[in-house]
Every structure is written in C-alpha cells, then in structure tokens.
From Swiss-Prot:
Organism this protein belongs to: Lacticaseibacillus paracasei (strain ATCC 334 / BCRC 17002 / CCUG 31169 / CIP 107868 / KCTC 3260 / NRRL B-441)
The keyword Cytoplasm belongs to this UniProt entry's keyword annotation: yes
Subcellular location: Cytoplasm
Protein name as annotated: Holliday junction branch migration complex subunit RuvA
Annotated stretches, region: Domain I: 1-61
Pfam families: HHH_5 (PF14520), RuvA_C (PF07499), RuvA_N (PF01330)
InterPro entries: DNA_helicase_Holl-junc_RuvA_I, Hlx-hairpin-Hlx_DNA-bd_motif, NA-bd_OB-fold, RuvA, RuvA_2-like, RuvA_C, RuvA_C_sf
Region: Domain II, residue numbers: 62-140
Length: 198
C-alpha cells in the first residue's frame, strides 16, 4: 500500500519514530530509532501490517531492510516483532552471510530465536536475502582467537551491523577489561562505546 514516507522526523523514542508528512504524523516502529534525528528531512521505507483490528506501520532506513523484513515474515515462527529485532542487531548483508554459512549459532543470538527457528530461517531464506538486489557477498569477519567466545561473538555482531573492522578491533582490549558474562552484555557495551555515550 505504501512504499515510503518522506518528511520531517518529529519525535524519536526507544521503540518508534514519528514522521510528519504534510502535516500528518505517522508513528513507525523501527529497528534502531536512534539512527534517526528529530528535525531531519528523511525518506523512510514503510510496511503496513494488518492483523485482526490492529494496523501497525513499520519503518526502515532503506529498501533492502524492508525486503529483508518481508522475507523474514515468510518464515514459520517469525512475526513482525521478531523480524524487527533481527534487523536491530544485524544488517541485511550480515544476515545473508550468516544464512549462507548455515550459522545457526549466530542466528540464535537474536531475541526470541531458538535453534529450531534459526534452522528454519536458513532453510527458507538461503540464497534469497539480498542487498540492493544482489546476494550479499561480505563475510562476517573473523575475530582474534585470544578472546572468549562471548566477546568474539559480540565483535562479529558489531561488524555485521556495519561498523568498520578496524574500529571494532580497537574496542577489543576495552571490552576484554569490561569482563562481561554474556554476548549481549558485550554487544550493548560495544554499541554504547561506538555511540560515544560514556
């Protein structure tokens, strides 16, 4: 029904943004709200999901993420919230690489994704997830072998999110000193450091 909205970002919250299009404010659930800035002119790709009596608009920074979102919805066990949570943690290209490599362990890092659902994602979407119309070619970069598996997984996730390998490598010692117990804790700290919020 809608391909994209173009207008002024009026509000940014932890879960959604509001975009003003010719005086009408649309609330869009997005993967990473803080990638948007209030007051900026922005084109946001959208997908309307209608379920029962509920109509929800989902927003995306690019057409590739919108395509990936809709492809994820074709997988048994994946709903809009799960699809958005995946996109909040990995780029379309990173997801394509994980699927191409049958990386169940990587996929199970996403909220609500167990081994069974991860295997289903690989089965249903292998060779289908694309970036700008072409299968993603970038591999998930290997990380140093002298870090524990939780930290290594977090560093790989940061690269998959699109951060430069050199930048991520520069966080290794800082995150090692952080001594977190889980991949999620390392990932959150890495994102905090990369965002410049001390």
């Amino acid at each position: 029904m809608y391909e994209y909205f173009e207008g002024i970002i009026q509000a940014v919250t932890p879960a959604y943004i509001v975009i003003d299009v010719h005086g009408i404010g649309f609330r869009l659930l997005v993967a990473n709200p803080y990638h948007f800035e209030a007051g900026e002119q922005k084109r946001v790709y959208v997908q309307l999901i209608i379920r029962d009596n509920d109509q929800t608009l989902y927003g995306f920074e690019g057409a590739a993420d919108k395509r990936t979102f809709n492809q994820l919805l074709t997988v048994t066990g994946i709903g809009p919230k799960s699809a958005l949570a995946i996109l909040a943690n990995v780029s379309s290209g990173g997801l394509a690489t994980a699927i191409a490599q049958d990386d169940v362990k990587f996929l199970t890092k996403f909220p609500g994704i167990g081994k069974k659902t991860a295997a289903q994602i690989i089965l249903d979407l292998k060779g289908k997830i694309t970036t700008d119309g072409q299968p993603a070619a970038a591999a998930i970069a290997p990380v140093a072998s002298d870090v524990d598996s939780e930290l290594a997984d977090a560093l790989a996730a940061l690269v998959a999110l699109g951060y430069p390998q050199r930048t991520v490598d520069g966080l290794t010692d800082t995150l090692k000193a952080f001594s977190a117990k889980t991949t999620d804790a390392y990932l959150r700290e890495g994102l905090r450091l990369l965002s410049g919020k001390a």
